[in-house]
Amino acid sequence: MAVYTDINEIELGAFLRHYDIGTLTSYKGIAEGVENSNYLLHTSSGSFILTLYEKRTNREDLPFFLGLMQHLAKRGLECPQPVVRNDGAMIGQLAGRPAAIVTFLEGMWMRRPTVAHCEAVGEGLAHMHLAGADFPMRRRNGLTLPDWRPLWNLSRKCADTVERGLVAETEADLDFLEKNWPADLPQGVIHADLFPDNAFFLGDRLSGFIDFYFACTDILAYDVAVCLNAWCFEKDFSYNRTKGAALLRGYTSVRPLSEAEADALPVLARGAAVRFMLTRLYDWLTVPAGSFVVKKDPMEYVRRMRFHRQIESAAEYGLEMQGVAA
């Protein structure tokens, strides 16, 4: 979450007249994040999050994102719920931006996730996949295999300035993924960006997921692969198999993986590492100093790519046989 668009109390008050959430008592910007402008609102009836959607978010996708949160909450998944305006809409206009209000989710994200946190996230992700199974809307993943080569081409010329040999490495990975990407695996709604800062905890208990603005329809096991990359590597870039086993155990306790999904996990994890390396690399090379966009080191994901190249089976990530459906 972040603040790119400033708002004043007068325009905020006018905006809030379209909602039945009580009287505004205070508001403040939330500094973390990169995509949209976010404010914490305190009113006489509770706390809420106000989001102003910036240029990186396609307005046409907002009904999918907000509708998904509404659907998941109705299915019992802990996540922010969109607050419906008095006119029945979920999206308004504030400071020249599309804007929405969602309920406040209690908890904190874990900067150093433990094994217990990883298991809870795996279990929660599986519950999300099951809860989203009957969500009627679809959204194409705009950052999946067919999109990686065009994105890479925007950075390719300068990639070796980040590390010598990165062009050859990335070309080889893309060639491999294009030849080996799995087909016919179970699909559904995925979060697609479930990093530690998008999962809240109260102690070791998962209190819910936030930031569904990359959610889409894609391979369910790809979401698991994203989480292995996001949750199970240490600061020294080593893979923590104990955390990986816990995450996979949590997931498969709710939704066992098929044999085909388990077999595909090394390719999916390698692809997820490439996806996040490419977006980081593009921002690293193109975002000017002083920009609001926080640049993240692409080399963290180059090291993950190198790790996944050595993996031959999901067992090496910690997947146990009882987690695979017969």
Swiss-Prot record:
Gene3D superfamilies according to UniProt: 3.90.1200.10, Phosphorylase Kinase, domain 1
Enzyme class: transferase
Keyword presence, Amino-acid biosynthesis: yes
This protein's UniProt keywords: Amino-acid biosynthesis, ATP-binding, Kinase, Nucleotide-binding, Threonine biosynthesis, Transferase
Provenance organism: Brucella canis (strain ATCC 23365 / NCTC 10854 / RM-666)
Pfam families: APH
Listed GO biological process terms: threonine biosynthetic process
Stated name of the protein: Homoserine kinase
SUPFAM superfamilies listed in its UniProt record: Protein kinase-like (PK-like) (SSF56112)
MF (Gene Ontology): ATP binding; homoserine kinase activity
